[in-house]
Amino acid sequence: KMTMIVGFISTLLSMLAGDMSAKFLHKVQPEKLAAYEWHFDTQSQANLVFFGVLNEKTNEVSGAIEIPGMLSFLADNSLKTTVKGLNDFPKNELPPLIVHYFFDLMVSMGVFCFVISGIFMLILLIKKLRHLTTHKVVLYSILLTGPASMLAIEFGWFLTEMGRQPWIVRGYLRVSQAATQAGGITLVTILFGLLYLVLIVTSAYVLLRMFRNKPAINDVNQVLKERGDNK
């Protein structure tokens, strides 16, 4: 219950942060915002683009879901706001356009968490539906919000780091100029990867051993029984 309440509030705050981020990028890093949305031509009433496939030769997007004027609205709270397109920036200063896919994935994971936590909140508010809190579909959906939220964070990180390319400090220092030449970096990276792999496998094994044939609902019922709560 507490997890879903906190999750619902957190997703709302994340949406607010996303709105603020769009406005910041519109003013400070417009090429980054344009890359996120595959926005090529400078115009007002710019559409917000979800999903789709880009033809990089023609800059045409197919199979996308577009919300008319929403990119302009996110940029400055007005459908008439002019959003600068990728065609108006030097090509050697543009981020890789793959960032759009990370944007889609981040938003999808965030929306999933918002919908599940919102449904759970609705179930709590309506007495006739409260018995659904222990329904398998609800419990499995809640379980999926854990990895979904982590994936949203990771995709957001990819989005941010790749979106600022080719700059370390925008307009002053490129990544190619700041990249370290120190030896041993490859070895350290491999060792860290192996360490995390061992931790993942070990953690999964321990958790499976702990909870196999021991459903959490049994522990919950035992606690309720000890408290004398039969509801």
Question: Residue ranges of each PLM-predicted region?
Answer:
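Juxtamembrane interface at the cytosolic side of transmembrane helices
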Residues: 1, 114-154, 208-219
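Aromatic-rich transmembrane-lumenal/periplasmic boundary elements in polytopic membrane proteins
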Residues: 6-75
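C-terminal TM-helix exit segments that contain a strictly Trp-centered aromatic cap at the helix terminus
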Residues: 10-22, 79, 151-164
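Membrane-helix cytosolic exit motif
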Residues: 17, 21, 198-216
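Short, highly charged, low-complexity non-transmembrane loops/tails of multi-pass membrane proteins
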Residues: 31-37, 214-230
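Individual transmembrane alpha-helix segments
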Residues: 55-111
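Hydrophobic alpha-helical transmembrane segments
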Residues: 105-122, 195-203
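Membrane-proximal extracellular juxtamembrane segment immediately upstream
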Residues: 145-191, 195
